[in-house]
Amino acid sequence: VASGVASLTFNRPEAMNALNEQVITQLTDIWKGLEEDPSVHTAILRGSGKAFVAGADIKFFVDKIEDDKIDDIREFTERGHDILNAIESSRINTIAVMSGLALGGGLELAMCCNHRIGVEGKTMLRFPETGIGIYPGLGGTQRSVMIAGVECARYSIIAGNWLDSNLAFSMGYLTDVVGYSGLEKAISNIVCGKVDHPNHKYQPRNPEDKLIKQILETFGDGWQNRLMDPASGLGPFEERQSKFIVRNAPVSIKMASELIDIANQSREDPAVGLQSELDGLDTIFSTKDALTGLRGVLSGKRVQFSGE
């Protein structure tokens, strides 16, 4: 901490700073200390190496499923929810510096921050979960809808598309995009109070962007009938999205879709959707596809999902 500004660095570069039990415990303890220090007004979160945070620790999930200890996964995720909720509701102004990859849980962590700075040509965001047999369980299905709207949440989570810095900014996942040389100045401007918090809830920042328009049209009402029925006469963009979706885990798609809808329906009480994410964990981690998909990540092999 220096001059009221706390700097937090996730330092597991060998694991791309993935969240595990130890990291969640450390973050919780550190955050409690910052909240209790009245001199702290800003916190800057960064990752060491090439990633901000590349999701949760996959081996932890596989080990717990194989040992029939899914309760431990739920407990870990509940603790993750607690600290992410604390960061989101904090009096402290928070800045996520996303100068590399932010995947899954890392993107979910960043979405709890007031400011999310990306670097042009370097920042890449993605929710890979439905492609590995699970769904974003640290608030991703809910905060994506709050930040970017239902259609962009479906594009990001259900289809699992990569988001470069410009698209992520147009959607709202990033609040600032700068060249690498301008990164420290952008951070300084926020610390000095020269940047207002963005406010465009439940819709993308730039709905007039050409790609955003396609996303709004493709992932609006009736998207399942269009994209999951190969005989429906799809255009090139829709056909690509359909291919992404049908290779993902069916139960993951179904549950993620339902959670995204809950986020849209419970705007007055976001806690409803966050609890729904937690309530579905036992179901999703008990599927054969979850173990298949998570093992596939560790082995580096593409897998086929059975829908079980």
Language model: regions and residue ranges:
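Terminal peptide-recognition signature
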Residues: L8, R12, Q26-L27, L45, ...
